[in-house]
Amino acid sequence: MEDDAPVIYGLEFQARALTPQTAETDAIRFLVGTQSLKYDNQIHIIDFDDENNIINKNVLLHQAGEIWHISASPADKGVLATCYNKTSDSRVQACAAVWRMPKELESGSHESPEDPASTAQTLELLCHLDNGAQGNVACVVWEPMGDGKKVISLADSHILLWDLQPSSSQAVLASSAALEGRGQLKFTSGRWSPHHNCTQVATASDTTLRGWDTRSMSQIYCIENAHGQLVRDLDFNPNKQYYLASCGDDCKVKFWDTRNVTEPVKTLEEHSHWVWSVRYNHSHDQLVLTGSSDSRVILSNMVSISSEPFGHLVDDDDVSDPEEHHTEKSKEPLQDNVIATYEEHEDSVYAVDWASADPWLFASLSYDGRLVINRVPRALKYHILL
């Protein structure tokens, strides 16, 4: 069973920000933000044509500054948020803003490759997530499955919940909380849980993971020394409400049950350098992607701690011939394993993410501007489905 070759797209600038176009459920589309100090920065809208195995792209100018983080609205295909650096008075400040792309680009009408003269279009600024004295913004996360009207920004030691007004033209600060403790505590990343009616957010700061209740903005759990060094990223299991994954500079990926945070449920040690990004598959939560500055992307099968630890079970009632029943998948838990290691990158892989429209396809981005689109191996796909 021949697997499709990876598809590689090169940006002319360095890049570390990647997101799927979350509200798009039909087309496979990713957004990539660049990091250039000398030239105007860009957002590349990457359309993947699955049938022909080719990439089409559009380029939007992001003149506000180099992009450190990008996230897409879960409700509106044309709306996105960026965290970017701007320099004023020889001082660098990390800001955040919400933008709208031109209407005709929301659904991927793309420039023809034969037309090099086609000019990049600009983004429309909807609003700044202006936190005043709160500090440098590390990331912006949208309320999952929401109407695109609630976002959280993490700025230095502050977690800020914003209500976006109609048409997102203004952001109103609804509530906030601050990290308390010794030293200069700073958030590095965060994720909004799709469970518990979307009332929980998890954050990483230094080596600690924390859970927050968005209604009271109070801390609900704390995992100190979750990693031996800085925590870089985290993600929630989409199917198991108390499970989350984290990764960090100790080269490890850890899986946690937030009801018992004394030790991780599982630890992976497959990378040889800092792990920058971890993502659960949106549909099949045993599939976990990680990207690292060892320049590798690893796809792991964490089936023992997934929502289907015994595989896809068939009810006795569904089997017409009892004699055939012994051929069904065994009721022993399946073994966790590394499915594949992808080595198309030659630089640090800062971001990995699954396509929102196809559960078997994912993208990875390395600092040299190389975006690689890969698929879950066919044999595993059919093993999961059948």
Swiss-Prot record:
**Modified residue N-acetylmethionine is at which positions?**
M1
GO CC annotation, single: EARP complex
Q: What is the tissue specificity? A: Ubiquitous. Highly expressed in brain, adipose tissue, spleen and kidney (at protein level).
Protein name per the record? EARP and GARP complex-interacting protein 1
* Family note: Belongs to the WD repeat EIPR1 family.
On subunit structure and binding partners, the annotation says: Interacts with two multisubunit tethering complexes: EARP composed of VPS50, VPS51, VPS52 and VPS53 subunits and GARP complex composed of VPS51, VPS52, VPS53 and VPS54 subunits. Interacts with SNAP29.
Q: Where in or outside the cell?
A: Golgi apparatus, trans-Golgi network
Native organism: Rattus norvegicus (Rat)
Task: List the transmembrane segments.
Answer: none
Q: Where are this protein's WD repeats?
A: 132-172, 182-222, 226-266, 270-310, 344-384
Q: Which InterPro entries match?
A: EIPR1, WD40/YVTN_repeat-like_dom_sf, WD40_repeat_CS, WD40_repeat_dom_sf, WD40_rpt
* Keywords in alphabetical order: Acetylation, Golgi apparatus, Phosphoprotein, Repeat, WD repeat
Q: List the biased-composition ranges (Basic and acidic residues).
A: 322-332
Ranges for the region named Disordered are 312-332
Superkingdom in the source lineage:
Eukaryota
Q: Name one GO biological process term.
A: positive regulation of endocytic recycling
